């Protein structure tokens, strides 16, 4: 990138930061009008477990101003049983019905300030999402199935025509029709569609996942069955129910598990992994979410946003159906001894962090700048990192996020997705940056 472009980007980022900092939380109607004028998808993952240690109830999406700047919320996650059905609670580590729809939410955590009443049919996150949608009528909520920990039995669900039909029917019954255990119909209207987060068809994910060579073809067939049954349900509700999927950044994973062009026949759009390229599992520090492969990268080939997006386009994906994933967290290393700016240097392991070693929220990382850590940038590669001489964090700050929104627009992509909304600060600074970058100006 030529120097004048660096200066221009810096000026734009400075202006954006001023606008974001100065802007008060927008009224729901104004935010909704603006987000839909732009035409880009803005997808945010809300984590089921965020209400606990992270103290992130659904209400914060409203009070921070995030909800008025999103088009979709993906609720993470719904589980898949060994016999290939959607279910909400199979025991410890297999679901959390309490968080989903049983926990009575007190008034101070409620979107509308009203506590859940004893004996009401729907409580918990699901009821709060329904209240959030009432305040933001254009906002859609999708149930995201699977994720890293709950993709174990996707292969079973997708294996045969009969298993696919039964699986899809169970998911629509549970989430779209809202037939929750013990409360038939109580959850109707909370979810508008389905997001498939199978990690990964015919490729290693979490240890213990069932993997079969035929997963690749079966994933396409599963999408077709979801589209068929969602459309049938939509004819009754007189509504289009969206179907989306989370797709990998690794070209080898793309080839092993996905039939490129075919899958987009059934998808409204797909979110593309734009992060976790590197982390504390690597012996050397690196970038976790760079726009382009940095000069001097020790890995060849290496991963980047551009590598991921170009990989899907080369395999037949329509540009407008690709939604770029942006992380609201960073990856970190400690015990770095190579000096310099810390990048591409040996480390002893993952950096200490609040919830998981080597993984820290943006809202925490932003406080490190000026407190012993120096912010470093590679504008050509589109990434930033913090370094204090021994510990390094690679992360996306507002400057990097804004650069990625400009890339989304220039590349003709369909929008941005974020993992996950609880990583942002109380002002929804990163979500506001996406909003600014994807709004015509």
Where are these regions (language model features)?
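Substrate-binding surface in catalytic domains of secreted glycosidases
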Residues: 89-112, 201-360
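Conserved, mostly hydrophobic/aromatic
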Residues: 73, 143, 196, 226, ...
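Surface-exposed amphipathic alpha-helices with a cationic face
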Residues: 36-37, 126-142, 146, 219-237, ...
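Glycan-recognition patch characteristic of GH18 chitinases/ENGases
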Residues: 35-181
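An active-site-proximal structural segment forming one wall of the substrate-binding cleft
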Residues: 160-194, 222-230, 255-269
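Secretory targeting and sorting signals
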Residues: 1-30
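Active-site groove signature of glycoside hydrolases
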Residues: 146, 175-213, 276
């Amino acid at each position: 990138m030529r120097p004048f472009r660096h200066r221009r980007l810096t000026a734009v980022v400075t202006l954006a930061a001023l606008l974001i900092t100065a802007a008060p939380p927008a009224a729901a109607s104004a935010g909704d009008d603006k987000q839909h004028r732009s035409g880009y998808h803005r997808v945010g993952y809300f984590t089921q477990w965020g209400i606990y240690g992270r103290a992130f109830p659904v209400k914060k999406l409203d009070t921070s101003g995030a909800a008025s700047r999103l088009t979709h919320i993906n609720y993470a996650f719904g589980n898949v049983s060994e016999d290939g059905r959607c279910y909400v609670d199979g025991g410890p580590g297999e679901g959390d019905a309490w968080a989903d729809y049983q926990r009575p939410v007190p008034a101070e955590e409620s979107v509308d300030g009203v506590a859940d009443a004893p004996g009401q049919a729907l409580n918990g996150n699901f009821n709060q999402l329904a209240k959030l949608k009432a305040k933001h009528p254009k906002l859609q909520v999708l149930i995201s199935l699977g994720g890293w920990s709950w993709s174990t039995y996707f292969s079973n669900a997708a294996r045969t025509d009969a298993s696919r039909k039964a699986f899809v029917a169970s998911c629509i019954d549970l989430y779209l029709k809202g037939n929750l255990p013990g409360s038939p119909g109580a959850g109707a209207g909370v979810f508008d569609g389905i997001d498939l987060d199978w990690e990964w068809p015919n490729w290693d994910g979490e240890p213990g996942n069932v993997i079969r060579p035929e997963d690749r073809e079966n994933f396409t067939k599963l999408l077709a069955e979801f589209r068929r049954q969602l459309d049938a349900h939509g004819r009754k509700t007189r509504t289009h129910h969206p179907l989306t999927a989370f797709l990998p950044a690794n070209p080898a994973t793309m080839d092993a598990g996905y039939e490129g062009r075919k899958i987009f026949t059934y998808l409204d759009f797909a979110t593309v992994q734009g992060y976790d390229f590197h982390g504390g599992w690597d012996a050397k520090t690196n970038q976790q979410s760079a726009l382009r492969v940095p000069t001097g990268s020790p890995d060849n080939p290496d991963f980047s946003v551009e590598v991921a997006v170009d990989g899907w386009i080369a395999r037949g994906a329509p540009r407008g159906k690709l939604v770029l994933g942006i992380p609201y967290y960073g990856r970190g290393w400690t015990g770095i001894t190579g000096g310099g700016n810390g990048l591409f240097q040996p480390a002893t392991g993952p950096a200490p962090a609040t919830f998981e070693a080597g993984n820290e929220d943006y809202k925490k990382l932003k406080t490190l700048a000026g407190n012993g850590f120096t912010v470093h940038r590679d504008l050509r590669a589109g990434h930033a990192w913090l370094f204090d001489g021994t510990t390094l964090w690679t992360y996306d700050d507002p400057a990097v996020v804004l650069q990625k929104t400009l890339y989304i627009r220039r590349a003709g992509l369909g929008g941005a997705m974020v993992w996950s909304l609880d990583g942002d600060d109380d002002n929804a600074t990163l979500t506001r940056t996406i909003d600014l970058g994807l709004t015509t100006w």
